[in-house]
Amino acid sequence: MRIGPVWAGAAGRGRARREALAAGDMALAARLLGRPYSISGHVVHGRKLGRSLGASAEGRGDGFRTLNLRFPHHHPAATGVFVVQVHGLGGPPLPGVASLGVRPTIEDAGRVLLEVHCLEWPERLGAEGAYAKLVRVELLHKLRDEARYDGLAALTEAIARDVGDAHRWFGAHAAERRQTTRDRI
């Protein structure tokens, strides 16, 4: 996406930010905002389906546990699957992968949800320890658009690919993330 170097006032800058987010250009959105685009909210209970899908790492049977945040708008500025960083769980920010959208494989209600799978689940939280915590999720890089899969097996394979892609992204951007990380909500 190409946006000119000059924006006409606040309205032009706002439009440029919305266009960058809609296009999935999270680096441009971060430059325009002066920080990574983020969503804050309290972690809520979900259907607990993620923990029954696959394994977060080879040899583990923990599935893809997620932190679920309700999204108040029916049309978020950005949708899809993203590399993210989670703040607010104590300790350093946690790397993750997140889906922001309507979960087309799981339900057709049209309800927007942010589901975050932390690549390194903090053991101190246990399986249930994040509920009701206020977290901030920074959307760092868009991996792909949201998609409808033919079943849970296909969805699990896609999530596993997303997790691998997120690990690779963090590996390639490790030094950059260390320099810009601030753990505050």
Q: Where is each model-derived feature located?
A:
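Contiguous mid-protein beta-loop-alpha structural module that forms a pocket-lining wall or clamp
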Residues: 1-34
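Conserved beta-strand termini and adjacent loop/short-helix elements that scaffold enzyme active sites
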Residues: 1-5, 40, 46
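Acidic/polar loop patches that form or flank catalytic/metal-binding clefts of enzymes
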Residues: 30, 40, 93-95
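Phosphate/ribose-recognition catalytic cores of enzymes acting on nucleotide-derived substrates
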Residues: 46-185
